[in-house]
Amino acid sequence: MHSMEVGLVPAPAREPRLTRWLRRGSGILAHLIALGFTIFLTVLSRPGTSLFSWHPVFMALAFCLCMAEAILLFSPEHSLFFFCSRKTRIRLHWAGQTMAILCAVLGLGFIISSKIRSEMSHLVSWHSWIGALTLLATGGQALCGLCLLCPRAARVSRVARLKLYHLTCGLVVYLMATVTVLLGMYSVWFQAQIKGTAWYLCLGLPLYPALVIMHQISSSYLPRKKVEI
C-alpha cells in the first residue's frame, strides 16, 4: 500500500519562456493598438472642422484609450505600471476612468449639439442606442467603484461580492463600448472615408484589445474571486 501525503499541493507547471514572451507581446500590442487607433480616429475626424468632428475624438479617447488602459492597469503581465503598488494602481484606475467619463460626456455634448444644429433626429441607429446604454452603464460602474473605494461610507457589507460584480459588469461595459465603436464604422461618415480592405482592417483593430482584456479578467481574476466568495 502506498502512503499518501495529505495537504500537499503539486507545484504548478512552469510556463515555457516562449509562451511567457508571447503573452507579454500580446499586451504590448494591445497598448499600441489602443493608442494608435485613437490617434487614427482623431486624424480622420479632423477636429475643429465641425461640431460633429469632436464626437469621435472624445469617444475614442474615452473608450478606446482611457477605459482600456484603466483596465489593463491590473494585469500582472500587460500593465504599464506593474512596478506600482496595488493602492497606486487603484488610484490610477480611478484617474483613467474619470478621464473616460469626462471625455464621454464631452463627446455626448458635441453630438447632441451637432444634431440640434443640423435639425436631425436623435437615437435613430443601433450605434446611438448601444452608445447611450454604454454611457448609462459606465455611470453605474463609476458608482459601484465609488462604493468599493469607500465601503464603510457606502455601507457595503460584502465587499468581495461587490468586487466580483464590478469586474464582471466592467467587462460587459467595455465590450458594449467595443460594439458601439464597431457599429460606428458602419456609419456613412466612416464608410465615406475608409473603404475596401482598409475598412475590414479597421473593423478588426478594436477587437484585439477587447480580447486581451476579456482574457485578463476571465482567466486571472474572476476564478480567484469566485473561490473567495
Swiss-Prot record:
Its main location: membrane. This is Probable transmembrane reductase CYB561D1. Heme b 1 binds at H55, H127. It is found in: Membrane. It is a multi-pass membrane protein. Keywords: Electron transport, Heme, Iron, Membrane, Metal-binding, Translocase, Transmembrane, Transmembrane helix, Transport. It catalyses: monodehydro-L-ascorbate radical(out) + L-ascorbate(in) = monodehydro-L-ascorbate radical(in) + L-ascorbate(out); Fe(3+)(out) + L-ascorbate(in) = monodehydro-L-ascorbate radical(in) + Fe(2+)(out) + H(+). Residues 46-53, 113-128, 191-193 are lumenal. GO terms for cellular component: membrane. CDD domains: Cyt_b561_CYB561D2_like. Its EC number is 7.2.1.3. The chain crosses the membrane at residues 25-45, 54-74, 92-112, 129-149, 170-190, 194-214. PANTHER family: OS05G0565100 PROTEIN, TRANSMEMBRANE REDUCTASE CYB561D1-RELATED. Heme b 2 binds at H93, H166.
